[in-house]
Amino acid sequence: MKRVAAVIEYDGSNFFGYQGQPDVRTVQGVIEDALERIFKQRIYTQAAGRTDTGVHANGQLIAFNCPNDRMTTEDIRNAMNANLPDDVYVKEVFEVPVNFHPRFDVTKRIYHYFILTSRQKNVFLRKYVWWFPYELDLDAMRKAVKYLEGTHDFTSFKTGSDERDPVRTIYRIRILRLKNDLVLIRVEGRSFLRRMVRNIVAALVKVGLKQWEPEKMKEVLEARDRSAAAGTAPAHGLYFYKVLF
């Protein structure tokens, strides 16, 4: 029995997050249902990240044991895509070592967050960007991210229900202005706490609006208190973009 990994993209709009749950539609659920139709047995998958309700993915990585050694990786990809709904797509399948685990063996996770700052709403993008019709000072936001890069206790930027070790490493945060008033916030790190990226984005927007000075980010981080930070940016602007391993 060989082990394979698959790079998956999905539109998170109509899912209750990635992780499988009873009685609701999840990304893991539809993937494992598709694999069961292909292999006539339940196949359990592991993923590099568990995205929340409404969050999208360009490069989610999953792994599973394939019970049919005669199928090529291209056969598996084609069979999965033939059995998956239109809002999930397998971009690539490849073999990995038998002990490979996407959650633990990934060395970098990259998230993208999109903010549309135009005064007019774009109804076609409403599920895929955060429409925020205010001018943002990107230079101030770029100064603020320097306080977040590196290894820190990110208690101020996690949800209260996340009991994991709050110490995380952010390798880099980039803020880019794209065309048509679209702002991209790219966050690179080894691993993240629940809603950590969205909470960071909300805090950066405070800086961009000049409600906070860039130095406020250091104060919030050192407070180690969720109530010291801003709110949470909407889920639909966030994309699990890519992993490296």
From Swiss-Prot:
Domain of life: Bacteria
Assigned keywords, A-Z: Isomerase, tRNA processing
GO MF annotation list: pseudouridine synthase activity; RNA binding; tRNA pseudouridine(38-40) synthase activity
Record-linked CDD domains: PseudoU_synth_EcTruA
Cysteines paired by S-S bonds: none
Keyword tRNA processing set for record: yes
EC numbers: 5.4.99.12
Amino-acid positions noted as binding substrate in the UniProt annotation, renumbered to this chain: Y111
InterPro entries: PsdUridine_synth_cat_dom_sf (IPR020103), PsdUridine_synth_TruA (IPR001406), PsdUridine_synth_TruA_a/b_dom (IPR020097), PsdUridine_synth_TruA_C (IPR020095), TruA/RsuA/RluB/E/F_N (IPR020094)
Assembly and binders: Homodimer.
Function: Formation of pseudouridine at positions 38, 39 and 40 in the anticodon stem and loop of transfer RNAs.
UniProt-listed HAMAP family: TruA (MF_00171)
Protein name (record): tRNA pseudouridine synthase A
Native organism: Thermotoga maritima (strain ATCC 43589 / DSM 3109 / JCM 10099 / NBRC 100826 / MSB8)
Gene name as annotated: truA
